[in-house]
Amino acid sequence: HNKIVAANGGRHPETGREKLREILMSGGDPLALPNRKVGQWMAALAEAGVESIRLGTKEMAFHPQRFDEAFLAMMDNFHETYPDVGFRLMIHFNHPDEFLLKGEDGEYLENPNGSLMWHPDTKKAIEGVTARGWIVVENQAPIIKGINDDADALRVMQRALYRAGVNNHYFFCGRDIVAYRHFNVPIEKVWNLLNESQKGLSGVEAHARLSITHYKGKTEVAAVTNEPIPGVPGTENGVLIFKILRNALDAPDRGKVCIVGRNPDAIWFDDYEDRVIYDEAGLYD
């Protein structure tokens, strides 16, 4: 693709798309593959002109020993060969219990300076990757019923991760997959949980946005209000505002919004179909 784009003035002659600048390696989990295979894929992407690689993995939570000296050596070799290619490690902690230590009383253990103590293996893994200044580490997590739908837990997690050099990237509303109504949390409740969890956090600790994935692209749940809008039908209980964050196929749509009347039981877009007030984003076309 990138070769064709370069040979045709910066756009693909059939699709009109520009070069592929950034690639997400996801799955499955790429780190279920051996280092050799991961390195080969990354090198191939770099050779194809990709400027930035993101790699999504749950291994930091499930198997932190995966980030051993052999893995780090592979990453160092890649960076030495392709120093201009950016790399982001997208990890997936859903709850602070996945990486913090607790005492017999169930409370998180503290270091002498008041910071929270990490599981040793996870601490070593995080320090191994963050010590390499060219690896950016970011966390993203879905909000899951009965698992992390708790503002206090989310606050602890965001603060502890940022202190360890991990950026808080996204929290997600659940998707409309098989049995999703059994573990998804209502959208408006998730927004309130995240908003409550970020009270008391610093600006940099509270960077995470709440995202829900529409077919048009990542969409932010930008606001939920409690008061009616005078003279506007359907706003008697307040409104929810969706905002398009990213639409790779139609970048001009970024920032466009959709306003719907509130539905406290809604867990997916179709639960708002009967209460759309304004939709410049085209979420309900």
What are these regions (language model features)?
Residues N2-V5, G9, P13-E22, G28-K189, ...:
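Conserved AdoMet/S-adenosylmethionine-binding subsite of the radical SAM
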Residues R155-D285:
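Auxiliary Fe-S-binding modules of radical SAM enzymes
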